[in-house]
Amino acid sequence: MELAVTRTSNQGGDLRRPGRGLTLAIVELTLTTAYIHLTLGGILFTLNAVGYSALAAAMVIVAVDRHPLVQRFDWLPRIGLLAYASTTIAAYLVVGPYFSLGWVAKAIEVAILTLLVADIHRVYGSPGGLLRDALASVGLGKRQMRTA
């Protein structure tokens, strides 16, 4: 006997949902820069690669898992990755060393930042919408209704 499994629109894993391509691009670019940092060797680059990998995994979990706790804090990986990539870019500009692969990694990180801003506008409508959801998730306001 075969059982047919169908997904409804409110379950995770539906690849037709809006924004899946955007999330996929963010995750792919994040894993790419993680790989670049991992191949450079040294503890600092290795830890940077681990951080990027963890944030990529968090983005996937938020995109796929419809658990209420995950959805309550779905803003956290976006802000975390935004801050992490920004800090990595700033540290590179201050410390160096400047070489071609480093600039490639920074270009990828700028692309990550750009896609994250687009994702924040897609999901929350504006940075203010993200702030409202973040505050509401810790009990300091009312969460806005979203269709995505």
Predicted regions: what is each one?
Residues 2-148:
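Membrane-interface extramembranous regions
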